[in-house]
Structures are given as C-alpha cells and as structure tokens.
UniProtKB/Swiss-Prot annotation:
Detected at high levels in caudate nucleus, hippocampus and amygdala; at moderate levels in the adult brain, thalamus, parietal cortex, pituitary gland, adrenal gland and lymph nodes. Changing residue 92 to R: In a colorectal cancer sample; somatic mutation. Residues 70-80, 141-165, 234-257, 308-333 are cytoplasmic. It comes from Homo sapiens (Human). PANTHER family: NEUROPEPTIDES B_W RECEPTOR TYPE 2 (PTHR24229:SF18), NEUROPEPTIDES RECEPTOR (PTHR24229). SUPFAM superfamilies: Family A G protein-coupled receptor-like. This is Neuropeptides B/W receptor type 2. The keyword Transmembrane applies. The lineage of its organism: Eukaryota, Metazoa, Chordata, Craniata, Vertebrata.
Length: 333
C-alpha cells in the first residue's frame, strides 16, 4: 500500500528506521522531513537485535511465570494481583511481537503484509497505554486501601470480581485509545521502493504527526501520571495529619508491603517511560538534525521503554515473598 503523506516508521515509539547498510540513503524519519544519512551505523544493525532479543526472551519468560503463578496459586488470587496479572499479559503480548520488529531491523524491509503491520503497531500502542493505566488503577486501589486503613473501615466493595471488572474497563478504554493507530497503520514504499510498516497520515501530514504525538503524550502519560501524583500527594498529607489507631496499625503492616511493591513498580515504569515522552516533547518543539548521535539516543530511549516489559517480574520476585514461595512450588510440580 502506498502511504499518503509522510509515514512514521514501524518503531513508532519515536525511534528512526535503521539506514540501509553501506551507502547514502534518504528516508522519511517520521517527522515529515526526509533525512539523508551519509554514513551507515553498522553497530546498531548488530546491537539492536541483540538487545531486543534479550528483552524478548527475559520478558516473555518472566511475564509467563507471573501469569502462571497468579493463576495457579490460590493464595495469589488477590485484588492487587488481578491488576498485576493484566499488566503481565500486556507486557507478554508486546514481547510476543517484538521478534517481528527484530526481523524488520535485520531484513531492512517489511515482508509480513499489512494485517500483521496493523497488529504489531496496535500491540505496541497497547503496551504504551495499558502499562500506565493499570498502574493508575493500582494506585487508586492503594489510595482507597490505605485511606480505609487509616480510618479503620472495611471495604466490602473491594472484591476479586470488582478487580476483574475494573481490568476489563481498562482494556476497553485502551482499545478505544489504540484504534486510531490501528487505522493509520499500513505498509508503504519509501523513495527506494522498499516496503516498510508505519503510520500513514493524510495531508497536512506534519499536523497529523504532531497531533499523534500530543495524543500519546497527554493520554498515555500526562493524564494518568498527574492522577497518580494527586492521589499519592493527598495520601501523604492525610497520613501526616491522622495518627493511626492501634488496630489500623495492625491492619496496615501487611498492606504496607503491597503499597511499597506498587510504588516501586510505578517508579520503575516512570523511569523507563519518562525519557520516551520527553523525547516526544523534543520532537514536537524542535527540529533536530538526524545525526548518528541523535539516532543512537533515539534507539537507547526506545530500548529503555521496551525494557519495562521485562523488569516487573524481577520486582515481584524481590519484593513479594508470596510470589517467590508460589513460584518455587510451581517449579517443583
């Protein structure tokens, strides 16, 4: 399919497609400007597939382990673990399609057709939105739990079934957010008639490109992160103002561990994703020359966001005693 306007490359998180090895290449970098590369970047050709393969192997193994532990261990069927399960599913789905991205880098063209192109880009954006929104829901849950503990109140509405309904709502909401990217995704041919997978925007393509970046930045980062910050700021204010009763302290000890786990997972997520979204701000406000340094930094930032999909299982293993115990019991079976 010939793309309308200037398509954005497959690596839609903000990286630029690898230049063809060996000669001068002029290609669209996803910003609406053609970038000419006078020198190849052979180290990226070798390094990127190795990094992505490591993320894929570790992420797929780790997230599969998380899913199995939560589904098979009765003691792991808690409200918080419902959200962790869905987070693992989202990360696992992304690692499943990462080999396609690796193949595209190695082949230097897109051989898989338009349907798979749309699916890969959709899953990529599912990962962008679902990660932060499930963490936002987990933060809301922690806020309500700690607030109820402070006030020594029970929460009859906080049930395993309710967590499933909330997770379904997140998936439906994320699906709505991802639909525009699925619609604009397609296979196009660049100036060298090499098929590529990317986001194809109509005229004026520069306006559409900036709109897509603002859309992802605001709905995929600013809005949920601001919500999370407001919740935890209010929670800290309340905890300082209210002295816990003795009964609340007893209740809070076990829940404090879960709150710490959620906070650490959230912190790692922000560490991995903030550079990507800051890079989006740079892409929106400046016109950087596509030098080897800029291209390399772009891939580092993108790889960092990819890495978030394989880090969470290690956090659960280090911070959750129940997860470690149940994981060992499954290995013995």
């Amino acid at each position: 399919m010939q793309a309308a306007g200037h398509p954005e490359p497959l690596d839609s998180r903000g990286s630029f497609s690898l230049p063809t090895m060996g000669a001068n290449v002029s290609q669209d970098n996803g910003t609406g400007h053609n970038a000419t590369f006078s020198e190849p970047l052979p180290f990226l050709y070798v390094l990127l597939p190795a990094v992505y393969s490591g993320i894929c192997a570790v992420g797929l193994t780790g997230n599969t382990a998380v899913i199995l532990v939560i589904l098979r261990a009765p003691k792991m069927k808690t409200v918080t673990n419902v959200f962790i399960l869905n987070l693992a599913v989202a990360d696992g789905l992304f690692t499943l399609v990462l080999p396609v991205n690796i193949a595209e880098h190695l082949l230097q063209y897109w051989p898989f057709g338009e349907l798979l192109c749309k699916l890969v880009l959709a899953v990529d954006h599912y990962n962008i939105f679902s990660s932060i929104y499930f963490l936002a829901v987990m933060s809301v849950d922690r806020y309500l739990v700690v607030l109820a503990t402070v006030r020594s109140r029970h929460m009859p509405w906080r049930t395993y079934r309710g967590a499933k309904v909330a997770s379904l709502c997140v998936w439906l909401g994320v699906t709505v957010l991802v639909l525009p990217f699925f619609s604009f995704a397609g296979v196009y041919s660049n100036e060298l008639q090499v098929p590529s997978c990317g986001l194809s925007f109509p005229w004026p393509e520069q306006v559409w490109f900036k709109a897509s970046r603002v859309y992802t930045l605001v709905l995929g980062f600013v809005l949920p992160v601001c919500t999370i910050c407001v919740l935890y700021t209010d929670l800290l204010r309340r905890l300082r103002a209210v002295r816990l009763r003795s009964g609340a302290k007893a209740l809070g000890k076990a829940r404090r561990k879960v709150t710490v786990l959620v906070l650490v997972v959230l912190a790692v997520c922000l560490l991995c994703w903030t550079p990507f979204h800051l890079a989006s701000v740079v892409a929106l406000t400046t016109d950087l020359p596509q030098t080897p340094l800029v291209i390399s930094m772009s891939y580092v930032i993108t790889s960092l966001s990819y890495a978030n999909s394989c880090l969470n299982p290690f956090l659960y293993a280090f911070l959750d005693d129940n997860f470690r115990k149940n994981f060992r019991s499954i290995l013995r079976c």
